[in-house]
Amino acid sequence: MTRSSQILAIRAGSLFDGERALGPGMVLTQSGLITGIDTSGAPPPADSLIHDFGDGVTVMPGLIDCHVHLSLDASPQAMANVAVEDDDVLLRRMELASTRALHAGITTVRDLGDRRFLSLRLRDQLTQNSIPAPRIVAAGPPLTTHGGHLAVMGGEAEGADELKAAVHMRAMRGCDVVKVMVSGGATTPGSRPHDAQYGQKDLHLIVDQACKHGLRTAAHVHAVTSIVDALEAGFDSLEHVTFFTAYGVASDQHLIEQISQSGTFVSLTIGSVPDSGKPPPAIAQRLEQIRANAARLCSAGAKVVLGTDAGLSPGKPHDVLPYALEALVDLGMPPDRALHAVTAVAADACDLHGLKGRLAPGAEADLIAISGDPLKDISAVHNVVAVYRDGHLVVDRRLKTETSMTA
């Protein structure tokens, strides 16, 4: 999409800038960037295009889902399908998944595991064909042990030589982040979420190599031992963080405090569509303990973001993030902090500080308009009436448009 040089003034009864509520105001954009925020009631600049959503609408940064799998179709056979489907079929489905996310107000996704780097191909195709879609922060196939969790995606690597080569390949292919299956998982036959897959030496090597290439690192960690190892190795984000042991779920307040004090991003893969079936048995049997630990992480001040695992199962379609926001508030996080987590904090987790997640001059103009006030009732996030990507209105369900003729 080409960036318009005309000034666009977006007015609404309430603004949330990614940090706090600003009250009624106006966001000014030009050439795809935010150029100003005005809450004084002043008129828009002369000859600007005005999008006036009126009272009862909140304008805020677009939502960011920090953990998705665009190549997974959210069916009961999602893992089996991704193993056998043709690349072109997968790419078309991934495009549809990205569109579904965009229409829910999700303007950035971090894809933490695809097959054969298809998320990079998708990103290129969307750009070349000017197709509106979320910004894709891509990991490519996740690193895993031979036959390990999600080995079906093609990221098997063990030992120093293979791991160095794997990180180098991701850097050369244009990945943004290196995803590592530090523990096993619940959706791969023969893999157990309470088992570690990589040792400390390998984890330090991966993080060191990723840093040399300027890449972020994300650790899939269900097992307590894997959480400890990934934290010590210096991963940028911890995914899931469910505290599994061979006997259930640990309640380790000391480790929770360590995580919180480290400043490491914690991507909670919570939230699902109601009445959509149960998660995998290993998760379902421990759900209440998992939620309790997630609540403790929030209370302890961990740097929480939301990653829905979208695509994994019928309860996790690619527009599930609003349900995850409700789940986060149910854990005890105030609505303003939950919105902060899926905007400004999430942008930082995706290495997009200053570009995404905030209403601030110089940030890219990825905005959404919500009917209602999600700061008072978080369920309002389901009521997205408009979505902007790079200053372009790409979803429009309710709008008053005019041109300013005043100075």
Where in this protein do the model-derived segments appear?
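Active-site core of metal-dependent hydrolases
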Residues: T188-A292, A300-L312, G332-P334, D348-C350
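Divalent metal-dependent hydrolysis catalytic cores, especially in the metallo-beta-lactamase
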Residues: R93-S119, A133-T144, C175-T188, L215-R216, ...
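His/Asp/Glu-enriched, well-ordered alpha-helical/loop segment
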Residues: E288-D373
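Active-site gating/metal-coordination segments in enzymes
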Residues: G147-H204
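Metal-associated gating/positioning segment near the N- to mid-region
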Residues: V57-Q128, K201
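N-terminal metal-binding scaffold of metallo-dependent hydrolase/deaminase domains
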Residues: M1-P45, V57-V59, G372-I378, H392
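C-terminal cap of metal-dependent C-N hydrolases
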Residues: G13, V342, D348, P361-T406
